[in-house]
């Protein structure tokens, strides 16, 4: 039990932080959503988004 997160105060702090984090994510611009984090690309390029929507339209073929 040496992690220190098992206390009631720690749990309350994490809940408040999670709420603040959600509000901050909503205000993030589209450019920030597609930012490169440590060499890993986050988000879909516009070409991939167009390709996925095109496949979705062609899928129901009965």
Curated annotation (Swiss-Prot):
It comes from Gallus gallus. Residues 1-16 have a biased composition (Gly residues). Belongs to the OCC1 family. Residues 1-62 are annotated as: Disordered. This is Overexpressed in colon carcinoma 1 protein homolog. Pfam families: OCC1 (PF15506).
């Amino acid at each position: 039990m040496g992690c220190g997160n098992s206390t009631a105060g720690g749990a309350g702090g994490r809940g408040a932080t999670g709420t603040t984090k959600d509000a901050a994510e909503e205000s993030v611009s589209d450019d920030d959503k597609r930012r490169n984090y440590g060499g890993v690309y986050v988000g879909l390029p516009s070409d991939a988004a167009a390709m996925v929507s095109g496949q979705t339209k062609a899928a129901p073929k009965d």
